[in-house]
């Protein structure tokens, strides 16, 4: 795109119905809308790209251990009935990294709280609606590879960071 920074964005934030419950979490952020109109956004849902259906059971990282522990093989991602969906989440994270690399992405805006995309907090692994500080698997992999990740509630911070890249 000739010097225009591309931004990886959770597809659910752009209105795509890819969430576990079959819904979207469409953002009404003006900056995201502007970047979308400029063609900067690279929509991506790691859970769907990893092979999980829509809708699907919710999943959480056991013990709220965080994405880095999953990447290291020290934690799993489980549904409330105990089904292990770790491999699908890892596959989606690897595909997100590949999409970021192929698009020249150095910044991402992802859905906070998600076991894939959370950047500051994730659910604690008890399936009781409680959160804990931590990152999702995709966020952890992207950050390990130099892509800076922001939650959807930190778009102004992402914009400031974006200015340092250009």
Give the positions of each predicted feature.
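Short, hydrophobic/glycine-enriched beta-strand segments
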Residues: 6-11, 43
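Short N-terminal binding/cap micro-motifs at the start of the first secondary-structure element
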Residues: 15-21
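Short, surface-exposed acidic-centric catalytic microdomains
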Residues: 25-76
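Short Gly/Thr/Asp-enriched flexible loops that form oxyanion-binding sites at enzyme active sites
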Residues: 113, 117-139
């Amino acid at each position: 795109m000739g010097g225009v920074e591309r931004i990886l964005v959770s597809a659910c934030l752009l209105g795509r119905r890819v969430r576990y419950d079959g819904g979207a979490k469409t953002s009404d952020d003006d900056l995201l809308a502007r970047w979308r109109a400029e063609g900067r956004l690279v929509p991506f849902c790691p859970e769907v790209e990893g092979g999980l259906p829509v809708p699907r059971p919710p999943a959480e990282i056991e013990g709220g251990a965080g994405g880095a522990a999953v990447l290291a093989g020290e934690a799993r991602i489980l549904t409330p009935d105990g089904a292990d969906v770790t491999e699908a989440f890892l596959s989606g994270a690897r595909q997100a990294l590949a999409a970021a690399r192929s698009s020249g992405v150095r910044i991402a805006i992802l859905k906070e709280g998600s076991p894939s995309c959370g950047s500051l907090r994730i659910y604690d692994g008890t399936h009781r609606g409680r959160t804990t500080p931590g990152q999702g698997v995709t966020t952890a992999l992207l950050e390990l590879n130099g892509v800076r990740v922001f939650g959807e509630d930190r778009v102004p911070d992402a914009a400031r960071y974006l200015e340092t890249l250009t």
